């Protein structure tokens, strides 16, 4: 798979200042990878070997199924199923252990071609992010201007920065991440609480003021899970 597909300028991800920028990065990498394998790449032998070996998780199967080219998905499924027939569910070999097939199935169940490419792309782009944070004041300002960081990506950035960022800037970066997450958490909690209060009979009626609470359930789930 061409590395250029998984290369995105960091500033392009952070310029919109809407939602979690790391979710935006993940979504962009997912979209590019799915479009790539649902196109002509599905006929490339090296790509087919990888998709046969790794398969796909439910989330990315659904994204692929939503694409218009169902034949591409069917051909990948055909090849993947045939590969499992050949390499997993074959006649038991003489010295094969009792759980050998189960271990192979477990490997397939816990792997995903798209996830592996997204993780690969994100790990490299985030290292670039850390370098930019250290070297460019403008980017530090841009980072601080983001709307929020979701909880899982706060965890990811803070854990990665302790390994991949200049120690001199780690505290400043961790504090910036905490500010983006806690500030949005306060707003979100207030919106969810307001939503709950609107079911009190005293707050009903044609002129009931829901404020920003109507989509607070969906926003809370996305904040907690990235999805």
Go through each PLM region and give its residues:
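Intrinsically disordered, low-complexity regulatory regions of eukaryotic proteins
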Residues: 1-227
